[in-house]
Amino acid sequence: MMTERRAKLKAKGTLRASQLMRFPTAVKRDAAIEIWMHDHPDELGAIARRWFEVMRNCGDDVRELLHDGHPTACVADAAFAYVNAFTAHVNVGFFRGAEIADPDRLLEGTGKFMRHVKIRCDSHVDAAALTKLIEVAYIDMKRRLKAE
């Protein structure tokens, strides 16, 4: 259903297409993610599981799916974060990371929208700061959805 504001913008020709990554097939719990987690039993998998669980716990409206081969967390159908395990590190990534506050300067990357935090087994990550970053990304996506 189109809101009155969106209807006015559309009538003026100023309504822009959404720049959000939308996944209408996202579900509360995706069996494919459980398989992915099972297939990553090592230390990097444990790191990925820990941070994906933080994403899952952001709110009742969090949905998930396996996108591009890695677990992705959404607010409803709009992706806000993901995890991915590589050979020597895990990325905790943010779909609109370039636009969220990062006071602890954890984010890496130079893309137009996306940023990530790289976690290696032998390095320390500020857990409180990363948890806050995930929460900020979740709240930011909720705000973006409400504004559409």
Labelled PLM ranges:
Residues 1-148:
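Charge-dense, helix-prone N-terminal extensions
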